[in-house]
């Protein structure tokens, strides 16, 4: 039996394909349309799935549009436009789709699943107690109370795109902590008064984007800690768009924590169609054939200090985890500026280290497991001195812990030849464009950046 899971219509469209209950493919719409955060699943992605696995017998959709329209009416918003898809769709619940994706890809049998996002149909935060696959809703917030909507409104107020550039706001929050306490109190009062943030926020003359970012992150972290402090469980699964706030995720150390590779709405394309445990695997997208070029990568890094890699199946989600990556030598002092120039990014934006799991505690302080760049750790003094290009302004690093080949072999050989235990790893794209997907995208990236891609 062939079944599809889908997300589309709002933002972060995605398609997942199951054959006889085995997940065989998942990809974000933007990789195929080349439109950042594309809400529509493009025809070329649908045709690719049809040609490779056949026509689906059932198609699941990640939310309930009737409930969503009820909430939009309550909020004074216009009804949703009618959604059109090639096949009939079966509607699911937004937060349940998140929760199922998180739980069924996690290592836990019993746990608490925490979902925080901008908004589903009505829910903006839910907690689920799960025992051997049996989900019980134990806590919830409904619209208009929403940490995700608050953070998106602050993103817009700072001059960036809501529902797309929240990660820039998060990075910018480390630039300064010297904000005006009265500005903080004014914004906090909006949160405390349960303001509806879906129409944006008026900050009455506050225009410094770094001050706005710092206040937004501080308020988010304060409210996030209130939520997690009440959770009584050893095992925690965290999903929803807010699970991408890697800075705040550093507070999850009291739990055995699992955050999947695509915790936002894209991952719900898997969750809405999933009803059993599967092994977590981020490499589910389009495949560029060929052996992973470990020797060539190291040679290029030693000669030019930077190289792109596009081999194997593309990652599902917003993180490049070695198969669609731009690698650089983190021991070069000005490497951060060089990579930011190639990618056209803001100078304050951080870069991640890819490092063997067994080396993490040598170079970074305590934190939760991070195979998918899903949290930050404080870098040790030694790391900050030796590898400054992977340390953010606040002294943290967003880590990718590596355990499996071929990336394990790459790091082992790199360490053996250079003594450096890590690589700077960032996504293979330039600012404003989706991550490279196929061979055609590779050529375009090489032409635009003059960086070799293997």
Model-derived regions: residue spans:
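Extreme N-terminal starter segment of soluble prokaryotic enzymes
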Residues: 1-4
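Flexible beta->alpha loop and helix N-cap segments adjacent to enzyme active/binding sites
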Residues: 7-36, 51, 66-68, 72-192, ...
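Active-site pocket-shaping loop/turn-to-helix segments
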Residues: 30-40, 214, 218
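Phosphate/pyrophosphate-binding loops at sites that engage ATP/ADP/AMP, CoA/4′-phosphopantetheine
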Residues: 44-58, 227-234
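Short glycine-rich phosphate-binding loop at a beta-alpha junction
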Residues: 54-66, 233-241, 308
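Active-site cores of enzymes that catalyze phosphoryl transfer or operate on phosphate-rich substrates
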Residues: 171, 177-218
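Secondary-structure capping and boundary motifs in well-ordered enzyme cores
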Residues: 208-212, 216, 220, 240, ...
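Phosphate/ATP-binding catalytic cores across multiple sugar-kinase/actin-like superfamilies
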Residues: 214-236, 414
């Amino acid at each position: 039996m062939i079944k599809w899971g889908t997300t589309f219509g709002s933002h972060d469209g995605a398609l997942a394909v199951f054959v006889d209950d085995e997940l065989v493919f998942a990809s974000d719409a933007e990789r195929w349309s080349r439109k950042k955060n594309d809400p529509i699943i493009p025809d070329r992605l649908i045709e690719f799935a049809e040609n490779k696995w056949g026509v689906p017998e059932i198609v699941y959709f990640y939310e309930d549009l009737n409930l969503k329209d009820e909430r939009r009416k309550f909020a004074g918003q216009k009804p949703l436009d009618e959604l059109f898809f090639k096949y009939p769709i079966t509607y699911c619940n937004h937060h349940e789709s998140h929760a199922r994706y998180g739980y069924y890809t996690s290592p836990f049998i019993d746990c608490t699943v925490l979902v925080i996002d901008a908004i589903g149909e009505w829910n903006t935060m839910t907690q689920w107690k799960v025992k051997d696959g049996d989900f019980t809703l134990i806590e919830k917030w409904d619209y208009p109370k929403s940490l995700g909507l608050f953070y998106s409104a602050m993103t817009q107020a700072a001059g960036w795109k809501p529902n797309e550039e929240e990660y820039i706001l998060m990075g910018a929050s480390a630039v300064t902590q010297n904000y005006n306490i009265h500005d903080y109190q004014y914004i906090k009062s909006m949160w405390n008064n349960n303001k509806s943030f879906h129409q944006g926020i008026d900050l009455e003359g506050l225009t410094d984007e770094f001050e706005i970012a710092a206040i937004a992150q501080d308020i988010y972290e304060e409210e996030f800690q209130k939520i997690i402090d009440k959770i009584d469980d050893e095992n925690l699964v965290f999903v929803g768009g807010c699970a991408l706030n890697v800075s705040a995720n550093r507070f999850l150390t009291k739990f055995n924590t699992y955050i999947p590779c695509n915790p936002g709405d894209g991952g719900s394309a898997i969750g809405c169609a999933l009803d059993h445990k599967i092994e977590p695997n981020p490499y589910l997208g389009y495949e560029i054939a060929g052996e992973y070029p470990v020797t060539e990568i190291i040679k290029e890094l030693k000669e030019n200090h930077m190289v792109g890699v596009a081999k194997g199946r593309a990652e599902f989600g917003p993180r490049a985890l070695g198969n669609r990556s731009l690698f650089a030598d983190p021991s070069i002092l000005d490497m951060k500026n060089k990579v930011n120039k190639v990618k056209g990014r803001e100078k304050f934006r951080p870069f991640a280290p890819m490092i063997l799991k067994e080396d993490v505690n040598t170079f970074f302080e305590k934190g939760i497991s991070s195979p998918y760049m899903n949290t930050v750790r404080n870098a040790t003094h030694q790391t900050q001195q030796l590898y400054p290009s992977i340390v953010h302004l606040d002294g943290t690093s967003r880590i990718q812990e590596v355990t499996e080949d071929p990336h394990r072999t790459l790091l082992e050989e790199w360490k053996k030849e250079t003594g450096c235990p890590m690589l700077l790893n960032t996504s293979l794209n330039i600012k404003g464009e989706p991550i490279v997907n196929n061979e055609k995208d590779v050529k375009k990236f090489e032409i635009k950046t003059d960086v070799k891609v293997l």
